[in-house]
Every structure is written in C-alpha cells, then in structure tokens.
C-alpha cells in the first residue's frame, strides 16, 4: 500500500508522533479508573461480596461488549468521512462520558455510561487506519509497532497514576481528571493531525459483501481477525487469577500487592521494547514469519508458567511473553494493510477491533471458569492449547494465501 504524493506532503512521520501521543493519552485515560472501579461500584450502593464481584465484572465487560458492536459502524463512517474526524469524535465523546461518570448517582447510571463509553470509543483503531493509509508499505510494520507502544505506555502508567490520584483526591475527581486528559487528546488531534481525505457518498460506499469481494484473500483476513481475538483471550484469561496465583507462589509476605503489580506490569514493559524492533524486522523478513514465531514462542512460555515455584520465575517468563506479545498485534495489523485497500481500511481495522473486544470479554470469563474448576495452573495450560490452535489455523491460512499485490 503506497501513499500518494499528497500523503508525503502531509508528513506521515509527524502524524505518527501525534497519533502515538493520542493513543498514549487515551490508553492512560481508560486505565486511570481501573484500580478503583470496584470501590466506585461499592460507593454507588452495591454491597455484599458476591454482588460487588458481579457488578464489577459487568461494568468492566460492558464497555468492551458495546465497543465490539459499535466498531464496524464507526469504521464505515471513517471510510466515508475520514479518519481524523473519527479521532476527534472519539476523544470528545469519551471525555464527556467521563465527566458524567464522575457525577453518577447509582449503579444503573454508571452501567449505562460504561456502555456509552464503549459505543463512543474507537480512537486506537482509527489511529491505526490513519497511519496505515499514509505510511509507505515497506515501513508499515515499524510504524504500526511503534504506534502500538503508545496505548501500551498509557495503559502501564494509567493504573499507577489513577491509584495515586484516588488516594489523594478521592474517587470522583479522578473521572474529571481523566476527562481533561481526553480533552487534551482532542485538542492535540485537532491542531496537529493532518489528513487529506476526499469524502465518499453513501451511494458510492462498498457494502459488506463488496468489501469481502475486494479483499485479495478473505480467508486470510478472517484468520487475522480470529488471531486478534485469541491474542486478547490469552492475555485476558490470566488477568483474573494473576494476583491470587502470585499469592499462592509467594506464601505469607507483606508486599503481595507490590509483587503482583510488578509481575502484571512487566509484559507491557517488554512489549514497549520489542514492538518497534520486531515490527522493523517484520518489514525485512515478512510479518507472517514474525507472527508465527511469536505465537510459537508464546506457547513455549505459557506451558512452564504452570509449573513455576516462585513469583520471580513467573515474572521472568511473563517478561519474555510480553516481548513476544509486542510483535503479535502489529504483525496482524501489517498483514491487514498488505491484504486490503485504503478505501476499506477504516472498516477492516474496526472489524479487527470488534474481534479484539470480544477477546477482552471472553478471556477473563474463560480464565475465571477454568481456575474455579481446575485450579490456577490449569489456566496457563488451557491458554497454551488455545494459542497452539491459533498457530495451526494461522499457518494454514498464511500458507494458502495468494501472492500479495499492492492495492490503494
């Protein structure tokens, strides 16, 4: 996918920097409220251990569920109206919803607002689509890998900042601070992102069937969507049991929260280091090779996690797993760029986001169910089997793909 001369004039490198900053701010904004979400649910009147766990799970998951539903609509609108306006819509919409969340008076209002947050989201997939349609094809892996580190960085710093802010100012003010971060993202995007987009009338838009027929390899694209979902399932399945597993490994120690936080964070740090480098390597040797190698590496790391005896052994393995994970989504996104045209980029990336959100909902449910029935260690083995299935499925799809042609 080669950019036009007008894209060169736009300066895609500057757009990449600004989009990275936007992904960082939205990633931080989303994760700022995560550390105290159950506490806020309790403040809104939910009492009792079981009810609190249930409502905390519902308000967490509903955002991803509604994001999965809304993403294709926003992707189609981005292909018609442009990606910059979708970035602005997302940042502004989420900022307003965050303000309203800070004013919620009961759990039902909060639940509706969490659903609305999912409906109005979509900054990251539209940022991916914007950069993918402007960057030279031979730099796609590096550019998308670099862009992915923005959201990861924000998600790493957000919980730390959110916890500190909640301790100093209380729970509700953090929502207003989060809204101000999103408004800053809106202003930066408005002033600094440049896009020359020719709006397409609704009549000229390709319908879903035509989108599928326009793909060089629909089967491969579908397999990439499934891969995205499984990546998130594998990541999310471990999240609900990580702290409890660390406690089981550590025994009676006083700083279990600190140890758990460190082990939870190290994959993100590793992904920050690996994503641009492996993306650049993918530009040289092919993102398909990077994808398969990273998936195999993930399986080889997940299996021993089930047999570790100390938290530090788990931490080392999770750091290495994070390095592999840093290559996965950028490799998928680069392959999507190679196998679709600029005309449908918004929808392709939004469909991919929908599968990612489905994985975000499914993963924690799977992990919780397995651990409840078979114990913590079984979660890692089952997750390894799921990723192994994905290796076989992806390998088969990549092996059958046609010779790539440049579209766009």
UniProtKB/Swiss-Prot annotation:
Belongs to the major facilitator superfamily. DHA1 family. MdtG (TC 2.A.1.2.20) subfamily. Confers resistance to fosfomycin and deoxycholate. It comes from Escherichia fergusonii (strain ATCC 35469 / DSM 13698 / CCUG 18766 / IAM 14443 / JCM 21226 / LMG 7866 / NBRC 102419 / NCTC 12128 / CDC 0568-73). GO terms for cellular component: plasma membrane. It is found in: Cell inner membrane. InterPro entries: MFS, MFS_dom, MFS_MdtG_subfamily, MFS_sugar_transport-like, MFS_trans_sf, Mutidrug-R_MdtG, Tet-R_TetA/multi-R_MdtG-like. Keywords: Antibiotic resistance, Cell inner membrane, Cell membrane, Membrane, Transmembrane, Transmembrane helix, Transport. It comes from the Bacteria. SUPFAM superfamilies: MFS general substrate transporter. The chain crosses the membrane at residues 16-36, 58-78, 92-112, 115-135, 146-166, 173-193, 224-244, 253-273, 290-310, 319-339, 378-398. GO terms for biological process: response to antibiotic. This is Multidrug resistance protein MdtG. It is a multi-pass membrane protein. The keyword Lipoprotein does not apply.
